């Protein structure tokens, strides 16, 4: 059967992909299979604790993974350990592409997503993996996010209209300029990396809403289609819900989506100042 030759012509000479493919296949043939290559053993020290196991105490357990037979991300290593070494290792994961936020954990000292962080290929270093800090732990790398989700629910993160006569009948129109204001806010995946990196949230998690929830509150405050901006601001007037933010900015540094919760909180504070001025003059 004759080989099919593909050609791509740009501004210069013709590039024949058949030759490139032949070179690629030759390189693959010449390379030694992963099973024959020298093992690249990487150590992972992982936080373990099972509250249902009598007498079990929090500890770090070390596992070894051959990087030649493992995907490039930390989540790949965790899945390999669970599938091939220790099925009792417990962690959350779902999308594997930085969308769902399920695999948020503390990796080598920073809060991030295991599915988007590459394994440190320095074999002399042990990669340390903990659950998100200052949270109750369900088991191993699974934090209890009940309080976090309750706080998110408290801000009513959905569109609210005072005139409900048109609800469900047609779309609420929004200008391109107003829609652009929501960029950098709606992309939040509620992974809790930012909130659990915030010292103010560590100290006052029962009262301070934290950067993730406050950024979502701001997202609805500035939505031109929402009619409850004043009411949303009113709910944040107490000393703790908003004002425990001291612009430490750990939240912005750690966000795996590159968002800026610290800036959103600062904008709420400016809106709050104007809101209080209006309340005094009224």
Swiss-Prot record:
Show the PROSITE patterns listed in the entry: 2FE2S_FER_1, 2FE2S_FER_2, 4FE4S_FER_1, 4FE4S_FER_2
Keywords, ordered alphabetically: 2Fe-2S, 3Fe-4S, 4Fe-4S, Electron transport, Iron, Iron-sulfur, Membrane, Metal-binding, Mitochondrion, Mitochondrion inner membrane, Oxidoreductase, Transit peptide, Transport, Tricarboxylic acid cycle
Pathway listed:
Carbohydrate metabolism; tricarboxylic acid cycle; fumarate from succinate (eukaryal route): step 1/1
Gene Ontology terms: biological process: aerobic respiration; respiratory electron transport chain; tricarboxylic acid cycle
- Annotated positions binding a ubiquinone: 203
Query: What topology does it adopt in the membrane?
Result: Peripheral membrane protein
Indicate which residues the UniProt annotation says bind [4Fe-4S] cluster.
188, 191, 194, 255
The prosthetic group or cofactor this protein requires is:
[2Fe-2S] cluster; [3Fe-4S] cluster; [4Fe-4S] cluster
Per the annotation, how and in what number is the cofactor bound?
Binds 1 [2Fe-2S] cluster.
Q: Name one GO cellular component term.
A: respiratory chain complex II (succinate dehydrogenase)
Reactions this protein catalyses: a quinone + succinate = fumarate + a quinol; (R)-malate + a quinone = enol-oxaloacetate + a quinol; (S)-malate + a quinone = enol-oxaloacetate + a quinol
A GO molecular-function annotation? 4 iron, 4 sulfur cluster binding
User: Which positions in this protein are listed as binding [3Fe-4S] cluster?
Assistant: 198, 245, 251
**Could you tell me which InterPro entries the record lists for this protein?**
2Fe-2S_ferredoxin-like_sf, 2Fe-2S_ferredoxin-type, 2Fe2S_fd_BS, 4Fe4S_Fe-S-bd, 4Fe4S_Fe_S_CS, Beta-grasp_dom_sf, Helical_ferredxn, SDH/FRD_Iron-Sulfur
The superkingdom listed in its UniProt entry is: Eukaryota
Q: How is its activity regulated?
A: Enol-oxaloacetate inhibits the succinate dehydrogenase activity.
4Fe-4S ferredoxin-type domain ranges (all copies): 178-208
User: Which parts of the sequence bind [2Fe-2S] cluster?
Assistant: 95, 100, 103, 115
Oligomeric form and interacting partners = Component of complex II composed of four subunits: the flavoprotein (FP) sdha, iron-sulfur protein (IP) sdhb, and a cytochrome b composed of sdhc and sdhd.
* Family annotation (NCBIfam families): dhsB, PRK05950.1
What family does the entry list?
Answer: Belongs to the succinate dehydrogenase/fumarate reductase iron-sulfur protein family.
Q: What is this protein called?
A: Succinate dehydrogenase [ubiquinone] iron-sulfur subunit, mitochondrial
What species is this protein from?
Xenopus laevis
């Amino acid at each position: 059967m004759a080989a099919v030759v593909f050609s791509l012509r740009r501004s210069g000479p013709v590039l024949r992909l058949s030759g490139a493919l032949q070179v690629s296949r030759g390189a693959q043939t010449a390379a030694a299979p992963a099973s024959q290559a020298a093992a690249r053993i990487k150590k992972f020290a992982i936080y373990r604790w099972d509250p249902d196991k009598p007498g079990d105490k929090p500890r770090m357990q070390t596992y070894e993974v051959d990087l030649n037979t493992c995907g490039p991300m930390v989540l790949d290593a965790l899945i390999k350990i669970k599938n091939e070494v220790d099925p009792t290792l417990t962690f959350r994961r779902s999308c594997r592409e930085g969308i769902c936020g399920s695999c948020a954990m503390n990796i080598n000292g920073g809060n991030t997503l295991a599915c988007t962080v590459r394994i440190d290929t320095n074999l002399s270093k042990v990669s340390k993996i903990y659950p998100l800090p200052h949270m109750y732990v369900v088991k191993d790398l699974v934090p209890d996010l009940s309080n976090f989700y309750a706080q998110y629910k408290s801000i009513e993160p959905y569109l609210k209209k005072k005139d409900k006569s048109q609800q469900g009948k047609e779309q609420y129109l929004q200008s391109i300029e107003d829609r652009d204001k929501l960029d950098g806010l709606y992309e939040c995946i509620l992974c809790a990396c930012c909130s659990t990196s915030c010292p103010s949230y560590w100290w006052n998690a029962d009262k301070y809403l934290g950067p993730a929830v406050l950024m979502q509150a701001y997202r609805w405050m500035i939505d031109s289609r929402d009619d409850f901006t004043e009411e949303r601001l009113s709910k944040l007037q107490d000393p703790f819900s908003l004002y425990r933010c001291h612009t430490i900015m750990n939240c912005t540094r750690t966000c795996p989506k590159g968002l800026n919760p610290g800036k959103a909180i600062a904008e709420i504070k400016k809106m709050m100042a104007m809101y209080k001025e209006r309340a005094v003059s009224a």
